[in-house]
């Protein structure tokens, strides 16, 4: 990811997503979740997006997609497994694009999609993939699909791309605290979200309008399924993941604090030695003696942040924690609303029962 890349500011402002793409993504992810493939392999469901870019309207239209090859488990002594997997992945991708072209389907790659629970799963590999796609085309995006929210009745598809500042740091593959601070990069502006408009056919729109105007079934008239607080497991899982991220952030804060103290001590020491060397050289020049070079001072090793990817992991953990907190807040507020509604309905039923009891007693008298 350290290749020199000419960074071009993207011009796309919104995304027009075909309903066919939504159905294919949901079907792909749901089938793998039902089979337990994602849990066994540990990889997220992923695929490639194809479509067209309309620069005059600042619009990216995603018209089709297809899943990518899943990484198969390999033996420890198989050193060429990763290379074979990449070759197979590229071969099948090119073969699918060739079939799209033959069938007169949009075959221009405009991004990729991945499935992450609670919308939180941004990792170093995902950032590398986003950089590769945006280096290939500045308008390319990634669609993050949340199967948990979708199973609760709310389709969750969000489009992201790396900001210009994050793209610049990713091209250098250098996430040192000084560069991140100089770029003004935080977890809030590291990614840019684009609004999504889902496009359906005219017949589908007419059908949906008729269904919305149709009277509800009598079986659902008194149904209490809308009051079901069926999000306990997902909420618990979200809170546990958030606690794990907070623990990692606490460790990162301690490492960053230690690095800041060591860096300040190092800078003060280098400054002091430089001042002394300059004064000594001035006195040597006055005596006519040769000056002493400062190579030994420049060779003093600066402290390093004790993390593998600089501040990248901390930024991603902060972004994931924010996504998990938003999910927990949304679910909690919905559950509290349902509890208040259920309580009001129960009180109304109890009051109605008492009124009927009193009326029956008075009539018998």
UniProtKB/Swiss-Prot annotation:
A GO molecular function term, named singly, is: translation initiation factor activity
Taken from the UniProt entry, a GO cellular component term is: eukaryotic 48S preinitiation complex
Q: Which GO terms describe its biological process?
A: formation of cytoplasmic translation initiation complex; translational initiation
Query: What's a Pfam family this protein contains?
Result: eIF3h_C
Q: What InterPro entries does the annotation carry?
A: eIF3h (IPR027524), eIF3h_C (IPR045810), JAMM/MPN+_dom (IPR000555), JAMM_MPN+_peptidase_M67A (IPR050242), MPN (IPR037518)
* Principal localisation: cytoplasm
The record places domain MPN at 15-166
Question: In its UniProt entry, what is this protein called?
Answer: Eukaryotic translation initiation factor 3 subunit H
Task: List the source organism.
Answer: Caenorhabditis elegans
- Encoding gene (name): eif-3.H
């Amino acid at each position: 990811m350290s290749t020199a890349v000419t960074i071009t500011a993207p011009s796309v402002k919104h995304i027009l997503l075909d309903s066919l793409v939504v159905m294919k993504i949901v079907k792909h992810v749901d089938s793998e979740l039902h089979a337990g493939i994602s849990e066994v392999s540990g990889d997220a469901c992923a695929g490639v997006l194809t479509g067209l870019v309309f620069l005059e309207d600042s619009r990216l239209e995603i018209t089709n997609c297809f899943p990518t090859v899943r990484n198969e488990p390999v033996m420890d002594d198989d050193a060429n497994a990763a290379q074979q997997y990449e070759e197979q992945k590229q071969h099948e991708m090119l073969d699918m694009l060739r079939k799209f072209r033959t069938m007169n389907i949009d075959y221009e790659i405009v991004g990729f999609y991945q499935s992450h629970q609670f919308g939180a799963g941004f990792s170093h590999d995902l950032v590398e993939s986003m950089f590769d796609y945006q280096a290939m085309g500045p308008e390319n995006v990634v669609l993050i699909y949340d199967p948990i929210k979708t199973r609760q009745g709310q389709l969750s598809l969000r489009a992201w791309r790396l900001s210009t500042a994050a793209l610049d740091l990713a091209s250098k593959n250098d996430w040192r605290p000084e560069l991140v601070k100089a770029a003004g990069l935080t977890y809030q502006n590291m990614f840019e979200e684009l609004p999504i408009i889902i496009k359906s056919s005219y017949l589908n729109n007419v059908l949906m309008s008729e269904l919305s105007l149709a009277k509800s079934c009598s079986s659902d008239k008194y149904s209490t399924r809308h009051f079901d607080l069926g999000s306990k497991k997902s909420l618990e899982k979200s809170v546990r993941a958030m606690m794990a991220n907070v623990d990692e952030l606490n460790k990162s804060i301690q490492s960053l604090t230690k690095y800041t103290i060591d860096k300040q001590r190092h800078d003060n020491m280098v400054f002091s030695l430089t001042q002394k060397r300059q004064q000594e050289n001035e006195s040597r020049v006055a005596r006519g003696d040769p000056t002493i070079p400062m190579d030994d001072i420049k060779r003093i090793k600066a402290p390093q942040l004790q993390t593998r990817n600089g501040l990248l992991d901390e930024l991603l953990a902060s972004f994931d924690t924010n996504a998990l907190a938003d999910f927990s807040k949304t679910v909690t507020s919905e559950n509290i609303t349902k509890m208040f509604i259920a309580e009001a309905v129960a009180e109304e039923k109890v009051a109605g029962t008492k009124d009927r009891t009193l009326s029956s007693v008075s009539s018998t008298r």
